[in-house]
Amino acid sequence: MKKIICSLLFIPILAACKKEETAPTEKTYSVKYEVVGTPQQNSNISGSISYISKNSPTATGSWSISGWSVTESNWALKPGDKVGFTATLSNLASYQAAIIVDGVMCEFDLAATTLPLNYPITLSYTIE
């Protein structure tokens, strides 16, 4: 009987000591996506870019002569949130692609070849 009473008294003590899990807290970030490239000789780079923005998971962008860049400022993100883009471009001789979060380069990719680079460039980063 004594053991049962002691056990019953011990349960509320354990419950009071239980650490509650807290949800990850949001923080405001500046996220910059960037792709610059060089076209194959006697050709132009063409294609499309889709990216995760603070307002849409499927925003789109266009390639210009100098490349593509977009910055999302004041973006409330929490650990585990994913940012990134896919650039589907053709006639590239070389490219450099990056994701920059709060001024720090988090992801980077580059390639150069004599053959056209006609495959998607995909970069993503998970907020820590």
Summary of predicted features, one role per range:
Residues 24-128:
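First exposed extracellular module after export/assembly in secreted or surface-exposed proteins
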